[in-house]
């Protein structure tokens, strides 16, 4: 086996490098392949514009994909929730890592729970999905769009600029800030972003059929099946990762995959929620079962007007 390290492309943030380093460690432990990190700056890292103004799709992954196609790195690691659903020519999703906790977390001043925040309290989040679902629960709070890494956002609470922020629990875990969490939203309260908590490993298609086949060593099939169902919802609704769409799939038995999804108006006033379960053994494999499940649930939601809520949210991008 070659001792030349495989080059792993990653964004420069603490969260990105921590999660990429973890993937590298697992890959090396399972395959013996040494890995070195190559730090890459994405457009999403340098722009000060709010993600809803940018469309929210691909702003954190395009630079990594460019580096892949240019041969500057062998593979790249992304937060799966940032990955566009449309395929990119020449690039393949080689692996989906085992999912971390997919839930959203509240980090509030004075240790406050979400239910205990006073009316009018300011809650920072960069996600229309979170704003929509939180507003449905607590329309009396003021939701403020914010940008920046986890440390920057948490600093706005510490400084008193905001009463609370909402972030992904998995992300807080990856940067060692779980002590800041004051409340955690169960998926029955706030459905996470499709793919939240999982990491995506991409490489060039031509390499995956040959020298980089070893990347399958970090692929976790149950997670891949679950996030496939979730991402099909996004694709069928023609919604980007900045849309107010939540989805979560999980195996409720060895052969039963359940998918829950919600599309909520950005002010929380309208919502289409749906749930469906599929028996995986009725299909050739789990990913095909997940794809069929996602398509059926998306079709049911579109019949209830979910696509119109997505379109309305896109037309009023400045709302969140």
Curated annotation (Swiss-Prot):
Gene3D superfamilies: Periplasmic binding protein-like II, Porphobilinogen deaminase, C-terminal domain. Pathway: Porphyrin-containing compound metabolism; protoporphyrin-IX biosynthesis; coproporphyrinogen-III from 5-aminolevulinate: step 2/4. Its EC number is 2.5.1.61. The keyword NADP does not apply. Binds 1 dipyrromethane group covalently. The keyword Flavoprotein does not apply. One of its GO terms (cellular component) is cytoplasm. Keywords: Porphyrin biosynthesis, Transferase. One of its GO terms (molecular function) is hydroxymethylbilane synthase activity. The porphobilinogen subunits are added to the dipyrromethane group. This is Porphobilinogen deaminase. It comes from Thermobifida fusca (strain YX).
């Amino acid at each position: 086996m070659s001792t030349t390290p495989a080059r792993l492309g990653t964004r420069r943030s603490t969260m990105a490098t921590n999660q990429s380093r973890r993937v590298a460690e697992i890959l090396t432990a399972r395959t013996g392949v040494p890995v070195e990190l190559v730090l890459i700056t994405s457009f999403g890292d340098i722009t000060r514009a709010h993600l809803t103004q940018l469309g929210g799709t691909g702003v954190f992954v395009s630079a990594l994909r460019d580096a892949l196609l240019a041969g500057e790195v062998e593979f790249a690691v992304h937060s799966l929730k940032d990955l566009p659903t449309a395929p990119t020519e020449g690039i393949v999703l080689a692996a989906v890592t085992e999912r971390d906790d997919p839930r959203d977390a509240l980090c509030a001043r004075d240790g406050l729970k979400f239910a205990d925040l006073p009316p009018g309290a300011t809650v920072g989040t960069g996600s229309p999905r979170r704003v929509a679902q939180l507003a449905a629960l607590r329309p009396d709070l003021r939701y403020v769009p914010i940008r920046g890494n986890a440390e920057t956002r948490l600093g706005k609470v510490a400084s008193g600029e905001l009463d609370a922020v909402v972030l992904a629990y998995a992300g807080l875990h990856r940067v060692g800030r779980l002590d800041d969490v004051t409340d955690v939203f169960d998926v029955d309260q706030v459905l996470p972003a499709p793919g939240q908590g999982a990491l995506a490993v991409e490489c060039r298609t031509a390499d995956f059929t040959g020298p980089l086949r070893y990347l399958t060593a970090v692929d976790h099939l149950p997670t891949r099946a679950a996030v496939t169902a979730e991402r099909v919802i996004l694709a069928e609704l023609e919604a980007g990762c900045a849309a107010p769409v939540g989805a979560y799939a999980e195996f409720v038995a060895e052969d039963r995959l359940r998918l829950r999804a919600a599309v909520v108006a950005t002010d929380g006033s309208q919502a289409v929620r749906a749930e469906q379960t599929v028996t995986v053994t009725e299909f050739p494999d789990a990913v095909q079962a997940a794809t069929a499940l996602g398509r059926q649930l998306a079709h049911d939601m579109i019949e209830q007007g979910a696509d119109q809520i997505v379109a309305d949210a896109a037309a009023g991008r400045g709302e969140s």
